[in-house]
Amino acid sequence: MECADYFIGSGRRCSPSTSTSTSREAWRPEKQWRKATNVIRGCHRLLRLGVLSAAAGIMRRNPSYVEIKVHDEGELDVSSGGDGEAPVAFTVAADDESFKGLVKNKREDCFRLLGGGAGVAAVLASGAERGIRGDDADVARRKKAFGSNTYPKPKPKGFFRHVWDALADVFLIVLLVCAAVSLAFGIKEHGIKDGWYDGVSIFLAVFLVAAVSAVSNHSQGKRFDKLARESENIMVSVVRAARRQEVSIFDVVVGDVVVLKIGDVVPADGVFLDGHALQVDESSMTGEPHPVEVDAVKSPFLASGVKVVDGYGKMVVTAVGTDTAWGEMMRTITRENTDPTPLQERLEGLTSSIGKVGIAVAVLVFAVLTARHFTGSTRDEQGNALFDKRNVTFNAVFSGLVGIFQQAVTIIVVAIPEGLPLAVTLTLAFSMKRMVRENALVRRLSACETMGSVTAICTDKTGTLTLNQMKVTEFWVGADRPRSAAAVNGGVVRLLCQGAGLNTTGSVYKPDNVSPPEITGSPTEKALLSWAVEELPMDADALKRKCKVVRVEAFNSDKKRSGVMLRDAATGAVTAHWKGAAEMVLARCTVYVGADGAARELGVEQRRKLEQVINDMAAASLRCIAFAYKQVVDGGDSDNAKIDDEGLTLLGFVGLKDPCRPEVKSAIEACTKAGIAVKMVTGDNVLTARAIAKECGIISGNDDDAAGVVIEGHEFRAMSEQEQLAIVDNIRVMARSLPLDKLVLVQRLKQKGHVVAVTGDGTNDAPALKEADVGLSMGVQGTEVAKESSDIVILNDNFDTVVTATRWGRCVYNNIQKFIQFQLTVNVAALVINFVSAVTTGRMPLTTVQLLWVNLIMDTMGALALATDTPTAGLMRRPPIGRAAPLISNAMWRNLAAQAAYQVAVLLALQYRGFGGAGAGERANGTMIFNAFVLCQVFNEFNAREIERRNVFAGVHRNRMFLGIVAVTVALQVVMVELLTKFAGTERLGWGQWGACVGIAAVSWPIGWAVKCIPVPERPFHEIITARRRRRRST
């Protein structure tokens, strides 16, 4: 695309249209006419350059255009922006592609022809101070012309794809083949009227299992997709109608003026408008790790997806969505993230081991049944041999083998606990959905599991332990504490207004003289600006007109201060202002001013008194901020000059109060009871940090005197690695810390065997968030870089939500253990019953359809029932579960063995002795065994709800899902036994037989209660056995 295309819009014409109204002719702004004239002159220049012919060719091929209309000022209800120009309306007659390649292809020549960033903004009916109009109609027109800021996502699996995946299981395929063979032989032997039952029954059973699995997977997939969309919906700061506001990244449109600060991710392609020391990390696009400085001359382009690492600025959006370089790359990505979580990987190993046992049993059963069948030992209900050795035919041999093979394969299907991965998916999906309701958005699935094993939490103070509702409660000018600003010299007040109102990333917007001002920015900036507006008082608009910002040094956690250089519009005098941590700023001051405006030398005694003022504020849990300034002699003309921060004049201090959250003390107590150490890592003064830690309950009066409990960052940095390892467990508070200190603290804790969770909100917290086992970013104050580096986003910035996430992490692990115990009980009982019965009687008590039904209720229904339990209070009264802890605990082995032994004993007794006397037939007896076995699993679901506690009914009334699944299972079992007799191979039972089945199943409750009275060692059984073997060998 030629440069002309950008100006005339790929054959589109820029046509200034004027109003014909004469009533407003007298006050039409001249700048609007000047803009229209500049557009026309630009077109004439392009004619002279000889490029219009190419543009005309494009115009003939594509006659659509963008039309910029300059309206009368009175026609718009938007006030003029600070750039002195009235907003212009943006009208689009057709699709436009003028700006799509400007940033993607880095067309600097076209950028210059358009007049730089301001020219691009003007063509897009926008401006640095006013932005776009931003009403619904304007946004809709821009979306229609340039598209929306969204990327195509890989199409999620449809329901039938899930069905297909479920049917792709090799053992289900074998069963389908066996069903087809059985159907063919059945029809051949018994005719189509009676011969289709067995084959079709197996077909239906297999498809039912696949359908239920598909429904579950499909619903969980949709839930995960919804959570993924929520995690991608970040808020972006834009200027619309001369007001700064937050909009969804999906609502950013071409022409929007985006405000960028440290930690932001650039939401779309755009060009630089204005700013100071703006640097971005383009490694996501180019792979280069070094920051790139962005300015209006050398590097004006900002690509979607890059991260701001320093400074701040504004950009005008030129392309969105798939028209950006990032969007083009995202369009090519179609692979879904299917990486298993650590728990899923461990469960796959367990499933594989159990599957091998099942296959071995199935092979033995096949061998035994084959031998008994072809020796004539297997007989039907009338006592006749199923295989007649005297009349051997191919059909008889093949049919017999298929039937036996079908039963053996069914044993494998039942034995392999395929419900374990489903249970993990279900409990993760359920937990993630509930966690979002409780303000914890999970970005990585593995974090859900890992939170259950956390032993140490390194948390920030501001906004996490405190309310983040800062307010100035103390004000000092030098060593004086005036009652109000009226008692302070006017020159000092003017300098304080400059320091508070212009050395800031916040903003003050006053829509009219009646409404209160709207203040935006970080909580600290908002508190300082509110104080300046209300107390000094400060006129933000007048201040911006009187002073021009020459240079800015943004605040970062290393310097703990920010600076700005201002030039007075009237006199040309240049002043440097600094604001930041009081002791840091005071250390660079040599002079201070009093309330009377007189400057005094800062001697040793006076410095000590001012330090005491700072300490008194800190001891009162106040954050102390100092203001200082310096007259710049050289005028700050050098482009690369740093703002001088030596020999400053102290203006004063303000103390900001940020109260602790009312619920944080109980949350920290809960962590202590749960065996989790809470460590506060803050950049605040050590006295402030200690006071807040005592208020929150992180340290007590006794702890305060212990060595290393409260430490400053520089002390920790000065230690050797061995010294750090020796003290790291004792640390409860680290004050005046740097992001590097937090990173090292996490590393040392992990070296000591801790599972570490870290909270963070700044860009510099990203390394610690990534290093931690679980990184938790703040959703309100956290930067986008911090959120991208984290595993969980705390949506309300509240420490109590961190504890909630820990509780849910433990619940995930606990629910999985419940299901493992339940399913292995079914697996063991089914394998032993079928194997023993096959060896001793030559037949299996449960048919293929019955076994598939058992597989359905234990794999899917059981997972649904047990994977949706909510956290209990008892979870936070036990120590964390180690990452290396076995999935099956000693208590689970105890419960499993007791229940499986009971089921095997009672069902084998039914198999051998029968029920109901001599009148009961073999089919009725098989139905009793099937019915009792299924009901045993239903009753055992209640036992599985609690692994340690004897009261298995605690809180069951609150779990409607569990009760619903139990009710549905019982209802379907009644249907299977009483109505689908042909399909299930059952016989209708009488009331007495049903009562007997329920009684047999109900005995599992007292057995479960009694067996939990038997103590088991904490140490895993396999470790005890291994240790004993080693001792025997050594002796």
From Swiss-Prot:
Annotated InterPro entries: ATPase_P-typ_cation-transptr_C, ATPase_P-typ_cation-transptr_N, ATPase_P-typ_cyto_dom_N, ATPase_P-typ_P_site, ATPase_P-typ_TM_dom_sf, ATPase_P-typ_transduc_dom_A_sf, HAD-like_sf, HAD_sf
Enzyme Commission (EC) number: 7.2.2.10
Database matches in PROSITE patterns: ATPASE_E1_E2
SUPFAM superfamilies: Calcium ATPase, transduction domain A, Calcium ATPase, transmembrane domain M, HAD-like, Metal cation-transporting ATPase, ATP-binding domain N
GO MF, any single term: ATP hydrolysis activity
EC top class named in words: translocase
Residues carrying covalently attached carbohydrate according to the record: N391
One Pfam family in the UniProt entry: E1-E2_ATPase
Entry-linked Gene3D superfamilies: Calcium-transporting ATPase, cytoplasmic domain N, Calcium-transporting ATPase, cytoplasmic transduction domain A, Calcium-transporting ATPase, transmembrane domain, HAD superfamily/HAD-like
Keywords on record: ATP-binding, Calcium, Calcium transport, Calmodulin-binding, Glycoprotein, Golgi apparatus, Ion transport, Magnesium, Membrane, Metal-binding, Nucleotide-binding, Stress response, Translocase, Transmembrane, Transmembrane helix, Transport
Amino-acid positions noted as binding Mg(2+) in the UniProt annotation, renumbered to this chain: D761, D765
Active site: D460 (4-aspartylphosphate intermediate)
Activation/inhibition comment: Activated by calmodulin.
Transmembrane segments: 167-187, 195-215, 349-369, 396-416, 819-839, 846-866, 888-910, 920-940, 961-981, 991-1011
Catalyzed chemical reaction(s): Ca(2+)(in) + ATP + H2O = Ca(2+)(out) + ADP + phosphate + H(+)
Similarity field: Belongs to the cation transport ATPase (P-type) (TC 3.A.3) family. Type IIB subfamily.
Primary role: This magnesium-dependent enzyme catalyzes the hydrolysis of ATP coupled with the translocation of calcium from the cytosol out of the cell, into the endoplasmic reticulum, or into organelles. Involved in salt stress tolerance.
Name of the protein this chain belongs to: Calcium-transporting ATPase 7, plasma membrane-type
Organism of this sequence: Oryza sativa subsp. japonica (Rice)
This protein's encoding gene: ACA7
